[in-house]
């Protein structure tokens, strides 16, 4: 929002120092806007690996869904590179980082970063886009679902990049860009076509043991990110030799491809078995994914809130206020809300709403297009709004 210009001024020095690097390659594995590059290679090989590893006893529905995914391969590739070009993204790619030991991105762990911390991490983005992908797939929107899955795999690839898992930015070390360019130039040498296991062997079968997607996803990503972080200190920093960089890139990219095949395998099973992992489980947090309308003046500078009321009459409301500008025309903004009641289940929530409060005496109107609410790895509410909200107003979404 424009009212947050003072926040941007705090960021100005940091943004200026990174700008020259950003215009080259600040992000993790390379990716082009046309769906090519290292990220796209990882996503493509993830599908190839799974196809090669598929055991003969996999259910027909899994095979059919894999075929649908293959038919939408270009959307997977486009999604796998899109986060580096998303106009809604944070300027410094803060949410592309995740230290598996601290659970933070560099905005909380780096001493030089003095601005507002960003709550989103590469790990949380994996879970968000996976939830959106499963939701759209189950509705038959395979093209959009595959694009979202590609976005999720982009962030998995980021979490599996040595510099990103160690929270070492291009400000911290020139090796960040150099190493990832090194890997991009040699990516075809690092392709793998199998994990060495069939889907009825331990690597794949273990992927299905935890029905709680959020819990499984976090620990699955953590196992790969820990290896990537160790690689930074042992083989990928600026003190290491070219041979050591070659080893680091080979291991990290092989793991990225292997892990991607695992995520896709889990995705295919989740969309095929029809189970709802959010049902009858305690909800610790809600994630709101809000799209602002694309027409002129649809955005707002006013204060925005999200609230819930439970069946026993308890209410909780949160401010929706990301660092930088949000609720801008055409923007897609994500907010995570921690629930005070740790024993709450999604069915215990009776009402949800968004509320607008005027920033100035006059305020301005706001036109949200859509809001999706995610709980326990599933989209539990999808509301098309497309209405103007004026003044101090509350709009009930449930």
Swiss-Prot record:
<feature type="binding site">
    <location>
        <position position="176"/>
    </location>
    <ligand>
        <name>Zn(2+) 2</name>
    </ligand>
</feature>
<protein>
    <recommendedName>
        <fullName>Phospholipase C</fullName>
        <ecNumber>3.1.4.3</ecNumber>
    </recommendedName>
</protein>
<dbReference type="InterPro" id="IPR036392">
    <property type="entry name" value="PLAT/LH2_dom_sf"/>
</dbReference>
<feature type="binding site">
    <location>
        <position position="39"/>
    </location>
    <ligand>
        <name>Zn(2+) 1</name>
    </ligand>
</feature>
<feature type="binding site">
    <location>
        <position position="301"/>
    </location>
    <ligand>
        <name>Ca(2+) 3</name>
    </ligand>
</feature>
<dbReference type="GO" id="GO:0008270">
    <property type="term" value="F:zinc ion binding"/>
</dbReference>
<keyword id="KW-0479">Metal-binding</keyword>
<feature type="binding site">
    <location>
        <position position="325"/>
    </location>
    <ligand>
        <name>Ca(2+) 3</name>
    </ligand>
</feature>
<dbReference type="InterPro" id="IPR001531">
    <property type="entry name" value="Zn_PLipaseC"/>
</dbReference>
<feature type="binding site">
    <location>
        <position position="321"/>
    </location>
    <ligand>
        <name>Ca(2+) 2</name>
    </ligand>
</feature>
<feature type="binding site">
    <location>
        <position position="158"/>
    </location>
    <ligand>
        <name>Zn(2+) 1</name>
    </ligand>
</feature>
<dbReference type="GO" id="GO:0090729">
    <property type="term" value="F:toxin activity"/>
</dbReference>
<keyword id="KW-0732">Signal</keyword>
<feature type="binding site">
    <location>
        <position position="326"/>
    </location>
    <ligand>
        <name>Ca(2+) 3</name>
    </ligand>
</feature>
<feature type="binding site">
    <location>
        <position position="84"/>
    </location>
    <ligand>
        <name>Zn(2+) 3</name>
    </ligand>
</feature>
<keyword id="KW-0106">Calcium</keyword>
<feature type="binding site">
    <location>
        <position position="322"/>
    </location>
    <ligand>
        <name>Ca(2+) 2</name>
    </ligand>
</feature>
<feature type="binding site">
    <location>
        <position position="324"/>
    </location>
    <ligand>
        <name>Ca(2+) 2</name>
    </ligand>
</feature>
<keyword id="KW-0964">Secreted</keyword>
<feature type="domain" description="PLAT">
    <location>
        <begin position="284"/>
        <end position="398"/>
    </location>
</feature>
<dbReference type="InterPro" id="IPR008947">
    <property type="entry name" value="PLipase_C/P1_nuclease_dom_sf"/>
</dbReference>
<dbReference type="Pfam" id="PF00882">
    <property type="entry name" value="Zn_dep_PLPC"/>
</dbReference>
<feature type="binding site">
    <location>
        <position position="158"/>
    </location>
    <ligand>
        <name>Zn(2+) 3</name>
    </ligand>
</feature>
<feature type="binding site">
    <location>
        <position position="164"/>
    </location>
    <ligand>
        <name>Zn(2+) 2</name>
    </ligand>
</feature>
<comment type="function">
    <text>Bacterial hemolysins are exotoxins that attack blood cell membranes and cause cell rupture. Constitutes an essential virulence factor in gas gangrene. Binds to eukaryotic membranes where it hydrolyzes both phosphatidylcholine and sphingomyelin, causing cell rupture. The diacylglycerol produced can activate both the arachidonic acid pathway, leading to modulation of the inflammatory response cascade and thrombosis, and protein kinase C, leading to activation of eukaryotic phospholipases and further membrane damage.</text>
</comment>
<dbReference type="GO" id="GO:0005576">
    <property type="term" value="C:extracellular region"/>
</dbReference>
<feature type="binding site">
    <location>
        <position position="29"/>
    </location>
    <ligand>
        <name>Zn(2+) 1</name>
    </ligand>
</feature>
<dbReference type="GO" id="GO:0034480">
    <property type="term" value="F:phosphatidylcholine phospholipase C activity"/>
</dbReference>
<feature type="binding site">
    <location>
        <position position="326"/>
    </location>
    <ligand>
        <name>Ca(2+) 2</name>
    </ligand>
</feature>
<keyword id="KW-0204">Cytolysis</keyword>
<feature type="region of interest" description="Linker">
    <location>
        <begin position="275"/>
        <end position="283"/>
    </location>
</feature>
<keyword id="KW-0378">Hydrolase</keyword>
<feature type="binding site">
    <location>
        <position position="299"/>
    </location>
    <ligand>
        <name>Ca(2+) 1</name>
    </ligand>
</feature>
<dbReference type="InterPro" id="IPR001024">
    <property type="entry name" value="PLAT/LH2_dom"/>
</dbReference>
<keyword id="KW-0843">Virulence</keyword>
<feature type="binding site">
    <location>
        <position position="180"/>
    </location>
    <ligand>
        <name>Zn(2+) 2</name>
    </ligand>
</feature>
<dbReference type="GO" id="GO:0031640">
    <property type="term" value="P:killing of cells of another organism"/>
</dbReference>
<dbReference type="Pfam" id="PF01477">
    <property type="entry name" value="PLAT"/>
</dbReference>
<feature type="binding site">
    <location>
        <position position="365"/>
    </location>
    <ligand>
        <name>Ca(2+) 1</name>
    </ligand>
</feature>
<feature type="binding site">
    <location>
        <position position="300"/>
    </location>
    <ligand>
        <name>Ca(2+) 3</name>
    </ligand>
</feature>
<feature type="domain" description="Zn-dependent PLC">
    <location>
        <begin position="29"/>
        <end position="278"/>
    </location>
</feature>
<feature type="binding site">
    <location>
        <position position="96"/>
    </location>
    <ligand>
        <name>Zn(2+) 3</name>
    </ligand>
</feature>
